[in-house]
Amino acid sequence: MTEPILQIRDLSVYYNQKKTLKDVSLDLYPNEITALIGPSGSGKSTLLRSINRMNDLNPEVTITGSIVYNGHNIYSPRTDTVDLRKEIGMVFQQPNPFPMSIYENVVYGLRLKGIRDKSILDHAVESSLKGASIWNEVKDRLHDSAVGLSGGQQQRVCIARVLATSPRIILLDEPTSALDPISAGKIEETLLLLKKDYTLAIVTRSMQQASRLSDRTGFFLEGDLLECGPTKAMFMNPKRKETEDYISGKFG
């Protein structure tokens, strides 16, 4: 059986000493999409932000348990969070391009690493925008502001910005919820293509999206991971009544 690329064990997250994520254990596997579903406030986004230590930015957060990536607990004091976030990139719910050109958005992380060679930057821009399925739409206006793009295009530029740092894992927090159906469909097509080269985890409120995209699904309720397994099996024959009720729209 394929070894997981990342292992979460007994992870708990406290906000102001209130336990909002409760002893969660979950594996992410190479070249798979894992969907995280559940009602609002159930802990999905909290888990996602724990995987690349975005929760560190909130001083009121305390975390226990472990997340093992590359053989090391990412919560070890030795972990360089800047390097970690290059390998485990994140795309947010609202498209958040920087107020600069499309080109500069994509190479932002590379410039932070000190890369100045134009040929390297040019290659990264083209390959990353192609990876995000937007190259043909913007190749003739790379020096236009990314803020002037449509919402769906902005989100794909944000995906390209993540790809440019050569991550192994991409985290997506409801990446299509602010988009129209056509733009959302383009994002979904892009994610399915990216699965060949990356591992993805996506928080989604859409059961249809989870069933279309994901290989595995985890169902969260009030901070607990109640059920996790292959998506087809979970949607066809959930083990927990709470899972069945949520998938069928009876609550949440």
UniProtKB/Swiss-Prot annotation:
User: What residues bind ATP, as annotated?
Assistant: G38, P39, S40, G41, S42, G43, K44, S45
Annotated membrane topology: Peripheral membrane protein
UniProt keyword terms in alphabetical order = ATP-binding, Cell membrane, Membrane, Nucleotide-binding, Phosphate transport, Translocase, Transport
One Pfam family, short name please? ABC_tran
Its biological function? Answer: Part of the ABC transporter complex PstSACB involved in phosphate import. Responsible for energy coupling to the transport system.
For whether the record's keyword set contains Membrane, the answer is yes
Family recorded in the similarity comment? Belongs to the ABC transporter superfamily. Phosphate importer (TC 3.A.1.7) family.
Assembly description: The complex is composed of two ATP-binding proteins (PstB), two transmembrane proteins (PstC and PstA) and a solute-binding protein (PstS).
Per the UniProt entry, what are the Gene Ontology biological process annotations, in alphabetical order? phosphate ion transmembrane transport
**Per its record, how is this protein called by name?**
Phosphate import ATP-binding protein PstB 1
Which PROSITE patterns does the protein's record reference? ABC_TRANSPORTER_1 (PS00211), ABC_TRANSPORTER_2 (PS50893), PSTB (PS51238)
- Signal sequence bounds: none
Q: Where in the cell is it found?
A: Cell membrane
Report the principal subcellular site: membrane
Write out the coiled-coil annotation as residue ranges.
none
May I have one GO cellular component term? Answer: plasma membrane
Q: ABC transporter domain: which residues?
A: 6-247
As its record notes, the protein acts as a catalyst of:
phosphate(out) + ATP + H2O = ADP + 2 phosphate(in) + H(+)
Work out whether the entry's keyword set contains Ribosomal protein: no
InterPro entries attached to this UniProt entry:
AAA+_ATPase, ABC_transporter-like_ATP-bd, ABC_transporter-like_CS, P-loop_NTPase, PstB-like
GO terms (molecular function) for this protein are: ATP binding; ATP hydrolysis activity; ATPase-coupled phosphate ion transmembrane transporter activity
Domain of life (superkingdom):
Bacteria
Query: What are the EC numbers?
Result: 7.3.2.1
**Gene3D superfamilies the record matches:** P-loop containing nucleotide triphosphate hydrolases (3.40.50.300)
